[in-house]
Amino acid sequence: MRSLIYFWLLLPVLPTLSLPQDVTRCQSTTNFRRFFSKFNVQAPAVVVLGGYLPSMNSSSWYCGTGIETASGVHGIFLSYIDSGQGFEIGISQEPFDPSGYQLYLHKATNGNTNAIARLRICQFPDNKTLGPTVNDVTTGRNCLFNKAIPAYMRDGKDIVVGITWDNDRVTVFADKIYHFYLKNDWSRVATRCYNRRSCAMQYVYTPTYYMLNVTSAGEDGIYYEPCTANCTGYAANVFATDSNGHIPEGFSFNNWFLLSNDSTLLHGKVVSNQPLLVNCLLAIPKIYGLGQFFSFNHTMDGVCNGAAVDRAPEALRFNINDTSVILAEGSIVLHTALGTNLSFVCSNSSDPHLAIFAIPLGATEVPYYCFLKVDTYNSTVYKFLAVLPPTVREIVITKYGDVYVNGFGYLHLGLLDAVTINFTGHGTDDDVSGFWTIASTNFVDALIEVQGTSIQRILYCDDPVSQLKCSQVAFDLDDGFYPISSRNLLSHEQPISFVTLPSFNDHSFVNITVSAAFGGLSSANLVASDTTINGFSSFCVDTRQFTITLFYNVTNSYGYVSKSQDSNCPFTLQSVNDYLSFSKFCVSTSLLAGACTIDLFGYPAFGSGVKLTSLYFQFTKGELITGTPKPLEGITDVSFMTLDVCTKYTIYGFKGEGIITLTNSSILAGVYYTSDSGQLLAFKNVTSGAVYSVTPCSFSEQAAYVNDDIVGVISSLSNSTFNNTRELPGFFYHSNDGSNCTEPVLVYSNIGVCKSGSIGYVPSQYGQVKIAPTVTGNISIPTNFSMSIRTEYLQLYNTPVSVDCATYVCNGNSRCKQLLTQYTAACKTIESALQLSARLESVEVNSMLTISEEALQLATISSFNGDGYNFTNVLGASVYDPASGRVVQKRSVIEDLLFNKVVTNGLGTVDEDYKRCSNGRSVADLVCAQYYSGVMVLPGVVDAEKLHMYSASLIGGMALGGITAAAALPFSYAVQARLNYLALQTDVLQRNQQLLAESFNSAIGNITSAFESVKEAISQTSKGLNTVAHALTKVQEVVNSQGSALNQLTVQLQHNFQAISSSIDDIYSRLDILSADVQVDRLITGRLSALNAFVAQTLTKYTEVQASRKLAQQKVNECVKSQSQRYGFCGGDGEHIFSLVQAAPQGLLFLHTVLVPGDFVNVLAIAGLCVNGEIALTLREPGLVLFTHELQTYTATEYFVSSRRMFEPRKPTVSDFVQIESCVVTYVNLTSDQLPDVIPDYIDVNKTLDEILASLPNRTGPSLPLDVFNATYLNLTGEIADLEQRSESLRNTTEELRSLINNINNTLVDLEWLNRVETYIKWPWWVWLIIVIVLIFVVSLLVFCCISTGCCGCCGCCGACFSGCCRGPRLQPYEAFEKVHVQ
């Protein structure tokens, strides 16, 4: 039968095997085999290709070399033979629309391999004349594409390229087929071909269909001919399956629907698990009474159209051509896995017992009623299902017992083994109205776009790039960073881990037995029912462990009975055994206090559901009793775990999914450890003391997406499938390019990624050192101004944050992710908002900041290189005598040894002049007497020689009385002169003491003033510290605010949002799938709300920081680089002098120096003067103000001009005024409605309030007496008291300084100071005599030693003289020994 089917499929195209394949264009011959090979049709296949394709008609080619134009065009194709000549193509609207996009393509003459063409899709300002281009410069605006593309075409290869458009779909036929989605209304083309052998043009106006027969791979296995009959049906319904089981991208999905069990998507995009992975496509153009058996356990027999996959189907899709109605007499028989055969039948009669069954294929005018037909050994039962739609286009049957008609689920049964289709034949051989296809498919995750309930296009989510697009619910993504989920490889059955404290564990079974019997005429009546629990009506667990087992003993003489449970308990009968823990657990068939209920239902084959029994569970939470799937008894640690793989765990009551890893840590306290959000981080095995970490099975990663490919991944894991891994601060980066990125196309914060996937830090913008000359000048500071420093902090950027929505909400739970697909748009909005805001901020910050390495080095004192400066060269060394104020000569060291130094007090230069005159001679003592202030004086120190001289003079004068009395005059004069010296010395000392006291008192006054300044400095410092504290507080708030927001976001994970638990895995372990979905949906909604709040806060912060960044740029330009003329802009209050800026965390800290005014003068300002009604004058300078001042006599008024910046009144001069046209002041009358046109931000508050009040409903407010009025006021008492306390503390400090100043003023000391005079006195004569005697003795002794020793000494000579008399016997001579040095 399969051979017959494929024979009729091949019959219409058999003549193509012998038809000529050549195409004549412009007197040259080519073919379309290479062109059709771009469709990648897998052999063997017979398909019809339809659309805007090139025609084989030779007259449709344009062969001229001039400019050709055409309208109403939907595509243009170019045929290339050889010669490498160029061409120009322009595509636009007609009439031309400058607000729309136009396409321009130009290829210059170049036959080499480096040939390029320039393609532009831009908004051109006017209708341009077609012409060549040489670069990327264009007059177009808002270009979507403006690049050079490869355009090398090999000679003699029958190349055909082109571009077609239809609505929003643009198809490019180049080296392969590319599809783009661009909204356009193109209809006019203009072309120019430089040589007809290189660029013969063909314009396409209408669709063209080709019958394509692919017998083998390659161009030689392609045969084609124009399709002439039933072309639309073939093209819309038949395709050749790709090698990977995918449906070709160009397929129209005619009569293919999105399967749904509830509501049907009308328009939009959705990620869904659908039977779209094709194993085999059977194309049957003719039906000849088939009764075909399709098994879900084996592959489909027959010849598949396109590629075939050896895989058992999960769903069979029957695609029907609805051009006319074909009554498929018979039914669809469903063979269940239980061995029961059920029939899906339809009839236009509502009475199935009298109906003739037939399933209409196509459109019908009468309704058809569908039933489920069940045949038993003695009767037939029909169960009504639904009414068929007026037009049947597709029927889908899955192995899971689902039957879909036009995408809607009509029937849901258990597992199926096979399905049988029974139809009768009809029509003639050339009648293909019953054409249909059968597709053997499997379920796969896919992104599906639906328009009007029909599938428009799909994207299979089976590779990393496609999975990324599916997660973003987008067929096309912009370049950027996107979150992806990295899941460890799992087996189908995940291992289970259970950890608890060691204890004595006994075990018991809770056996629940449900007995029921169905009978009666309808076979749906419950005849008997009984339920026992371990043989009784109730049972309470009294062991440490237990296992619930449920037994059904249900009988029905008419067929099988299915069962189900309905529970309002936080668990099911099956999930209790999944290591759920309790403190108390009882079950009963009768009502218990505070118990929850589980109802058990039975569903007979041909009736409605009946409640068999109700079980009541009374329990309390705890860890005393644990449900286990099997007994775990004994005094032992019954814990078991699987390490280093993804496992489902129950650890000390925590349920979840993660990877358990042994660590080297040792923790004394506790047995399990959680995060702030309640997530399990680690636990300790109390038996061994080992600490194990618990990490998620899936990790959030960021994929770098560039040019429709993932070029790199930012991950917290060190292992990856990429070839290169780089460890960066805080994460690992995986890519196939390990080089450093220098030209990033993606920028996120300070990280950039290149097209190749390499990563690097974004290079800073470097600026040249700006050399500004230093200008000095004198300025005048008003006395009523005070200088102050104001601090201001402006934030420049935020710390970028990226949130993986799926990971945050579901924490890797697969079922939760399926539910989250309903909220995929919300997740995409959240993630894209954060990503785009962070990238925009990164671009703005990087373009704002520039770095100068030289300026940075000069500005940093720690790195300033000052080694070349030797300041010691300018420091000289000299001996200075502070007493004389001159450089004096000091005695040598030897002189200090030979003389005694006596320190006395002297008068100025008296001692020095005396020493210079006497030159050490005692007899010149009186001769060298000095005069000081007219009084003769002598130095007060007398040496021994002078003492003996004056003593001899005194004795001589006393010896002979009056005769020798004159000899005592020298003594008298010397004594008087020395007494005068002492008297004058005393006077000088007193005057010096007075000067010193005055100087000390002046110093005390200066110290007092200094303390006054210190007091004022403390006050100013207090104010300065206060302003700096405010700035630092703002910096701290900026740095900590984002961390607080993230912490708050994390805390939300421990909230259950009215679900039974905040753990998703715990919910699914306790409840059945439907009940758990309801609970998890609450968690999803709550966590998405928390994410939305966080994103809204973050986006608001981005907006604030963007405004702050712009303000910082203005303040740098106006305050730092220049002097601001705006009052209060730099510093908040006062006239700006200069500003300094310093880098701060995430921003800039400004230090503004301003003049703050203290006093103000109120004047009456005048805008202008009008003289005699003829001359009108106004001030020339805008910074001046004209005002009046009445004289004290009130007899006249004076006019003054002053600067607005400082009150400096002066008489006006002629140069201050400028004459204007007239004294008439012109006003423009506006209504309140017109004022916003002039002042857009003007708001009429009164009118707005009136409108609000008018819109309020007229109601009488309640009477609220004041005695019951409760108002809450902002209490700032504590803050005010703290400020007053600080002020009082500063005042007390000031008073203490004042007390110290008074004490210093009262401490005036009269000091006595005596000048120091150094006088050297010679030793007496007997000292010198002793010295001479000692020297003579020493010298004599040395001379004697020298002449008395040695062979030439005197003793030796004397000995030789007397040798003859005293010589003894001669001794034998001896040989002298030579010294020998042995090395």
UniProtKB/Swiss-Prot annotation:
Residues 969-1088 are annotated as: Heptad repeat 1 (HR1). Residues 1240-1336 are annotated as: Heptad repeat 2 (HR2). Disulfide bonds: none annotated. A motif (KxHxx) lies at residues 1379-1383. The chain crosses the membrane at residues 1325-1344. Residues 26-1324 are virion surface. Residues 1036-1080, 1272-1314 form a coiled coil. It is a single-pass type I membrane protein. Keywords: Coiled coil, Glycoprotein, Host membrane, Host-virus interaction, Membrane, Signal, Transmembrane, Transmembrane helix, Viral attachment to host cell, Viral envelope protein, Virion, Virulence, Virus entry into host cell. GO terms for biological process: endocytosis involved in viral entry into host cell; fusion of virus membrane with host endosome membrane; fusion of virus membrane with host plasma membrane; receptor-mediated virion attachment to host cell. Residues 955-975 are annotated as: Fusion peptide. Residues 735-1383 are annotated as: S2. The keyword Calcium does not apply. Residues 1-25 form the signal peptide. Residues 26-734 are annotated as: S1. It is found in: Virion membrane; Host endoplasmic reticulum-Golgi intermediate compartment membrane. GO terms for cellular component: host cell endoplasmic reticulum-Golgi intermediate compartment membrane; membrane; viral envelope; virion membrane. Residues 617-745 are annotated as: Interaction with host ANPEP. Its main location: virion. Residues 1345-1383 are intravirion. The keyword Phosphoprotein does not apply. The KxHxx motif seems to function as an ER retrieval signal. Belongs to the alphacoronaviruses spike protein family. S1 region attaches the virion to the cell membrane by interacting with host ANPEP/aminopeptidase N, initiating the infection. Binding to the receptor probably induces conformational changes in the S glycoprotein unmasking the fusion peptide of S2 region and activating membranes fusion. S2 region belongs to the class I viral fusion protein. Under the current model, the protein has at least 3 conformational states: pre-fusion native state, pre-hairpin intermediate state, and post-fusion hairpin state. Homotrimer. During virus morphogenesis, found in a complex with M and HE proteins. Interacts with host ANPEP. This is Spike glycoprotein. The gene is S.
